[in-house]
């Protein structure tokens, strides 16, 4: 079998285990046959990418490669191995230790590094880890063509040779400098919109997800006007365990009963939100004070807002679509662009979110899932703004020919769907290098200053419903100020809160909290995950994909509607069907493999009027996915089946659901993903029982065997 690409949406992630505990002889075979990342894999992966940059003449010997991580590697084995890979390749490893992803990528830009490695599995469970890569200068993440080259390089390397290779690159620790830079960056009023006075009287519960923000967040949030309670700041308790954004995805409000007795029992942040809200209930009912929450993910690049509603005694969850809408409204109030500003979101977003921002004056664009595609748009439009500035200043025919060549190459890259971040970055840099060599750095710096002005940069907002909201920021390096676009959970939180405080009514009312929950006429939105899958079964041309496509088309035969199958340039593997009414989008239904977790999902988006149709469709398609796409060789899938069998005849306690043959898997994770994510089982007190969906899956599975 030809292996083209081992990465997912955002780098590579998976369950981690020390090499000595695996049966494979080398890190690649362990990954391919056991689906496990070892510390040796981390060394091989960073070495391979540094070699890629050196051979592409993007880096030279002893150039810098920044590396940092979230706190999940408690032993340090994986972190140290990744550092060794950098040094064996001949680059200088600039270690910044535990910092949020935005701080690491920012420091890479600050020191002019060739790349940055972030060792994290983001919102994934604590038993997993991974590697994100940012390319120097552009700060782009790797695209599919980059991933393919890196995959082939990893497959061709002999780890035994690498094991004995010398450490020829240097090592330095810049943690203090990188930490200081990020604190100063976030304190700069240019980089968030929040006025400290607007926090007066607020209580803010901050959930660091036991992740990368844990050792830093109290120094970042030092506004004296607000009262802070910091939760989940102890990595020893497990990153993302009953904390962070992942379990809040798709949730718009959480009742008091769910927090005290139900699905969210034991979630410290939610418990404190409820307790603090009830303590101040009378005060909250009669003025504009709020009990708020900031919830980050493990590596700190995204955020959800929480707000206690005293009228309903519940906690509202403000996701990415809603935060982006609030931020867009505030931007529109504060700026007049030279062109219509651009709002970018992904296919996961509510269809009505795009329509809502169009109505307030934005041009909209939809891209594939993953903030790397949003970063691409921000980088491309930033480059275009600089190019227009240069063209107004430079008459030389040589420059005009060069810029036309670069533009043509980038257009061809997009049209061919061969997205290549290193190729794009080198092209961006070629123009800047020409200006620097032939005219001088002063013009380059003035172009940076020009595009740092929001009205000159038409990229306004990039948004994912998962809580990535990306807007323009500015980084000062010496006498140069340059634009920066980074997924930054804290910046997102502060900007969203600033927008809400400006746009809101003066006094708390039931209508205010309803507006906070739903500021635009929302559509129908449902995402149904299937865990422990064989992702190859969704490949183009596979029998199951064809069967799934036919099943979708048969069940989307709605009156007076047309259906079109759409192939996204950025993610051709996704099966996407648009439903049109009078030629206009009415619904979108798609199935895609997750690029960050061991799962696939069915996504349904559409107008509220189509809710019954879409729910009926889900009832037919979701069981098919649950039954057909599980990876029969996955220990998690096998354990899941055993749990269903154990519960077939009645409720059981946790002790009755453990299996000696699956001692290495996390039972807590398994039960969590079977219950809160797939709805196959449910918990009542200290017992577990099978749901109707679980029983259907079990019955059909037994029949097929």
PLM region spans:
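Phosphate-binding and adjacent anionic-ligand microenvironments
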Residues: 292, 296, 308, 314, ...
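Short amphipathic alpha-helical interface segments
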Residues: 414, 633-660
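N-terminal small/polar loop signature for handling phosphorylated ligands or for N-terminal nucleophile
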Residues: 58-128, 219-304, 423
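Active-site phosphate-binding/coordination module
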Residues: 106-162, 297-300, 398-401, 465
